[in-house]
A protein has these predicted regions:
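Glycan-recognition and catalytic cores of secretory/periplasmic carbohydrate-active enzymes
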Residues: 2-192
Length: 192
């Protein structure tokens, strides 16, 4: 079945095109998109899960899972929930002597690595449906959603380390930056 496509209106550039109806035909870009689909997206998924031998761990998906545990405990205990608090004074937190505790690890903006990955997955799935990749993305999204608070807040740096400090340092700690990438990834995945 031939895919329905749209062409850009040469006189009305502000009319948006649905990605599902755009077909890239240029040989250079098709090759690059195929490279992203077959090599970059799988590699990045492994990197997000700290499964790339020799590469520094990102702790990204570990942080989402950890934030999900904190949120589950907060919901279960309600008003009796007391968060273990960790310092918020570092740009990057690494395990000491290889030993990890319950704190956030990685760069304080690490959440964006996942949200940019899911955005790339969305664009890839729009052009090339892949049930296995979609299943991986859906499962990862479920883990991320488990970390989200009931009020919609989602930034693992604060959810794990100290929820009382949410939105107290917008200048330095990348909360709005992370939110922007989360929004872009969510919209792309929803619209595909």
């Amino acid at each position: 079945m031939k895919k329905e496509t749209e062409k850009m209106d040469q006189k009305n550039f502000s009319k948006p095109l649905s990605l599902a109806k755009v077909q890239v035909t240029d040989a250079f870009w098709k090759k690059e998109m195929e490279l992203v689909r077959t090599e970059v997206i799988p590699y990045q998924w492994n990197a997000l899960n700290d499964n790339v031998p020799g590469a520094a761990p990102s702790f990204c998906m570990r942080n989402y899972r950890r934030a999900g545990e904190v949120e589950k405990e907060r919901k279960a205990k309600g008003d009796k929930f007391v968060q273990i608090k960790y310092p918020l004074d570092t740009f990057e937190t690494l395990p000491k002597d290889g030993k990890m505790d319950g704190r956030f690890y990685g760069f304080l903006f690490q959440d964006t690595d996942f949200t940019k990955w899911v955005e790339a997955v969305a664009y890839s799935l729009t052009q090339h449906p892949d049930p296995e990749l979609e299943k991986t993305a859906d499962e990862a999204i479920e883990a991320v959603c488990a970390a989200q608070r009931e009020d919609g807040y989602l930034d693992t740096y604060y959810l794990i380390n100290d929820q009382d400090m949410i939105f107290t340092n917008l200048k330095d700690n990348h909360e709005l930056y992370c939110f922007g990438h989360l929004t872009e990834g969510a919209v792309a995945y929803y619209q595909r």
